[in-house]
Design a protein with these regions (language model features):
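Conserved beta-strand positions in the central sheet of alpha/beta enzyme cores
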Residues: 61, 95, 126, 165, ...
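Active-site-proximal loop/turn and secondary-structure-junction residues that shape catalytic pockets
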Residues: 39-41, 64-66, 99-102, 129-133, ...
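Glycine-rich, proline-tolerant flexible connector loops at the mouths of alpha/beta enzymes
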Residues: 61-83, 132-137
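Active-site mouth loops of central-metabolism enzymes
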Residues: 32-43, 97-107, 136-142, 241
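Histidine-acidic metal/acid-base catalytic patches
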Residues: 18, 22-37, 41-58, 83, ...
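Tryptophan (W) side chains
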Residues: 8-11
Length: 299
């Protein structure tokens, strides 16, 4: 009888452990992994979908710049078709990246971009970049100008659905880190305006990653995963393989888990290599992050 009781207790304990492990695994994998298609330049839509499946992600951070299959000239017509083709292959497009000069709702294709994304079911639109210049407007005057532009973009978001997102990018970009990007977005409805936080850029000019993500927590909509490093004297940072740069990956993943972040994570894989090599390196990036997630589950 004692043996049976012990066996029952052991079995029950194992079931509880298995349940807890399943819950932790689901929490760790709630984020949706996608890949930035900028460096898949030259591939058509079938080629892009094949690459994404090879990398092991769920979809695309679709580059909608001139020269790509979906671009400002055809986005309202082509993006809904492409989204359907993606869905038929079990893939998704939760984010599009627009041209770097897409910083005004008055630009001729703004309405087309938002309408196309709305019809295609794309949840997030990454804007271009506002650059601070020594001979330009005073910083705070420029902040006011940008916020006026964001008011117009937020109206498009409210009308068509996709959220307007600002990417944290190092250098003299307005919104280069969490504190500065909050100067731009704070006060807007997080339903329509959000932050696209980039681990690499934050690592060279941002706050400690857990602090950085807490600062933008209310507006955090999308993450970019890449690693950067900067040597003394460098004007900017250089992309390196994940785990070789300044990003604290374990703290990043731990913080996102504590925050219950379940949004898209765009693997940027900005390696200046031939497309096939970029695909191979992106696959390694995904494997690297999955490995850390599994370590966290076991710990």
């Amino acid at each position: 009888l004692e043996t049976k009781i012990e066996s029952w207790a052991t079995w029950k304990s194992n079931i509880v452990k298995l349940r807890d492990l399943t819950v932790e695994k689901e929490a760790a994998t709630a984020m949706k992994f996608i890949m930035f298609t900028k460096h898949l330049e030259g591939l058509d839509i079938p080629g892009i979908m094949k690459a994404l499946k090879s990398v092991g992600v769920e979809g695309a951070d679709l580059c909608t710049r001139p020269g790509y299959p979906v671009n400002p000239d055809n986005v309202d017509r082509e993006l809904p078709k492409v989204a359907k083709r993606f869905a038929d292959e079990g893939l998704c497009i939760p984010l599009v990246t627009t041209p770097g000069d897409f910083i005004s709702a008055d630009i001729d294709y703004a309405e087309r971009m938002y309408a196309g994304c709305g019809e295609a079911g794309v949840a997030n639109i990454k804007l271009g970049y506002w650059h601070w210049r020594p001979d330009g407007p005073h910083y705070w005057e420029y902040v006011d100008t940008i916020r006026k532009e964001l008011e117009e973009f937020s109206k498009l978001s409210e009308k068509y659905g996709p959220k307007t997102c600002i990417h944290t990018h190092s250098g003299r970009d307005m919104g280069l880190n969490s504190c500065s990007v909050m100067h731009l977005v704070k006060g807007f409805d997080p339903k329509y305006v959000g932050v696209f936080a980039d681990t690499g850029h934050l690592s060279i000019c941002g706050e400690p990653i857990d602090m950085a993500l807490d600062i933008v927590k209310e507006y955090l909509s999308v993450m970019a995963f890449k690693d950067l490093m900067r040597r003394p004297g460098d004007r900017g940072g250089g992309v390196v393989r994940m785990g070789k740069g300044f990003v604290d990956w374990k703290l990043t993943l731990k913080t996102l888990k504590v925050m219950n972040f379940d949004g898209p994570v765009s693997f940027h894989s900005e390696y200046r290599e031939p497309v096939e090599t970029v695909i191979d390196l992106a696959r390694i990036d995904v494997r690297f992050i999955n490995g850390l997630l599994q370590e966290g589950i076991r710990d």
